[in-house]
Design a protein with these regions (language model features):
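N-terminal leader/targeting and accessory segments in enzymes
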Residues: 1-101
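Phosphate-binding loop of NTP-binding sites
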Residues: 68-71, 80-170
Length: 170
């Protein structure tokens, strides 16, 4: 794990409790952050998806708008589906809160190197092919991002020398 100083001991709001939000919360807890999770859905609606977070020391603010969770936070990690211009994101930036996406946060904390693939067509094919090429070359390779496996999840146990091949939205 690298660059934990950006998050260790800080109050970090993670917005969106789908796969990438759950993994982001796990990685941030491992980095020593005081994690606050938020989703507009209540815990009952999220159901078993929150199970990976059961034994982690985090604060839950579920079933309420993210705008109501901004006071006292140092940083905010948003899920890939949250637009940069969402009102609560703009408000957080206005308040001086460090706002980043799950992908950037995972890169900052995970050991290893990243190759990011973006574009209009062919991203999934390219990412999958590169993953196989690097694996066959003997590299420990994680195919992550919009391909369905969160970078944060792979980053939990990453080692120096690991390679992340990441599909990124255009």
């Amino acid at each position: 794990m690298r660059n934990t100083e950006k998050y260790a001991g800080k109050r970090v709001l993670v917005v969106g409790m789908a796969r990438s939000g759950i993994a982001a919360a796990q990685l941030l807890c491992k980095a020593g952050a005081h994690v606050i999770i938020n989703d507009s859905k209540a815990a009952e609606q999220l159901g078993d998806s929150l199970k990976p977070l059961e034994n982690l020391p985090l604060e839950r603010r579920l079933g309420c708008p993210a705008m109501e969770c901004l006071d006292g936070i140092d940083a905010m990690v948003i899920s890939p589906v949250v637009p940069d211009n969402a009102p609560f994101v703009l408000k957080a930036k206005e308040m001086g809160v460090y706002v980043t996406g799950e992908l950037e946060m995972a890169y900052q904390l995970s050991s290893g190197e990243m190759v990011a693939i973006t574009g209009t067509n062919g991203k999934t094919t390219t990412v999958t092919l590169l993953g196989e090429i690097f694996r066959n070359a003997g590299r420990t390779t994680h195919v992550v991002g919009n391909i369905g496996y969160p970078y944060s999840a792979a980053g939990l146990d990453s080692q120096d020398g690991d390679l992340f091949v990441c599909e990124v939205s255009s």
